[in-house]
Amino acid sequence: MKLHFLSLLIISTLFNCKNDGNNSEGNYAYLGGEIKNPNSDFVVLSKSDVVIDTIKLDSKNRFLYKIENLESGIYTFYHGGEIQMVLLEPKDSLLFRLNTFEFDESLVFTGKGDKKNNYLINEFLENEIQEKKIFKYCQLNPDTYQRRIDSLKTLKLNKLKAFKAKYAPSSLFDKIAHANIDYSYYSSKEVYPFVHYGNNKGAILKSLPKNFYSYRKNINYNDYFLKEHYPYNSFLKYSLNNLALENHTTHSNNDVFKRSSLCYNLDRLKLIDSLINNETIKNKLLYYFTANYLLKSTNTEKNEALVSAYLNKSSDETDKNEIKRFAASLNNLKEGGTFPSIKIVNYNNTEFDINSLIKTPTVICFWSNTFYNHFKESHYKLNELKVKYPEVKFIVINVDNYGLDKPKAALKENNFKLKDEYQFKNPKESLETLAIHPMTKTIVLDKYQKIVYSNANIFSMNFEEQLLGAINRK
């Protein structure tokens, strides 16, 4: 691995030397990498939702790419369903290595531009850990909670100050790093009433100090520069949840707040439409909240009402068509309905219609190499359930479109048996038909191939109760 990266670095340096004389402005950068356990044979590079190029991996799963006429800023590379951001500035020669089984955790940058990008990825990972602490802190009273998160913000600012003193990064990096700290902090404030114990969220909001959300007056909800930044996008979602809640409590007669309330979700779409003017940001948020509602709802009439509101507000025709197809797929998976005919293949490449396998109460689960931790944890859980419920058939389907060899190897490497393991014959079509999102989605059927639960989760506290309901159906 080190030898591979040394060779990449030498190649990058040679390219720099060769081209510096022909590009006096130095308005270019190199991005290269090596991917262990690749999910495909290419990476996609983009900026601001515009694809720059699709780059093939070589025989050693490496690539090196020169970006001409570089516009300094955040670039995105996609590989096998995973996404990573990198900050590129003129004359950067940035190299990375990663393992798809632990995408973010394994990502390491080297070369010119590595310090700032390693700082940003480490900050992202630290924020993921810190988020769990913040959810615990949310049970504190508002003043104590404020002091805790203020302290965390101060630590981050001190760390950034030390980094700047040592490496003297650009003003662009400084802008991004400060925005990440600020918006992570603001998210901590916005999430408080939702995570704080108690169902009367309106009362919790009223109990907060008057200046608790004073920063909002300085927030730009249409910041095009930050539109692809994770902390900013997370903040927007938390803040819109909160602002919609404030509005909802003014006309709701129910003290017990329900996130699944159609009224609340319609309030939120209306708020997005009125507050956000940038079409890109607005359309993404409208899509996100509409899809999220549909995933958790089994009420067709309410789904239609929300979809109608969404279609009237979004200007993205591609997104609108996706939402319509998604809603139609969910409608076809109504509880009590017949499971659709789906072709699957086992690891001997034998094809089946999935309904031909359903003769007893059945649980259908899904996994992907992209979500490797979920793959392992779900199989451990399924092994437990198979022992406890021998009368239930468990069908486990890999949703990837990489052929049989890669998922088969993953199963064998982890000592998981191949019995009852399958792949979709037509992954793209089947994913859409079954509306598989998130990957934890589990479908429970009775022995008559009727859908009992279309959106269960083997990790939920009431899953075994749901399973017993399917078993005991007459």
Language-model features, listed with the residues they occupy:
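Long, charge-rich alpha-helical interaction segments
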Residues: D223-K296
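Thiol-/selenol-based redox modules, centered on thioredoxin-like
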Residues: V444-K474
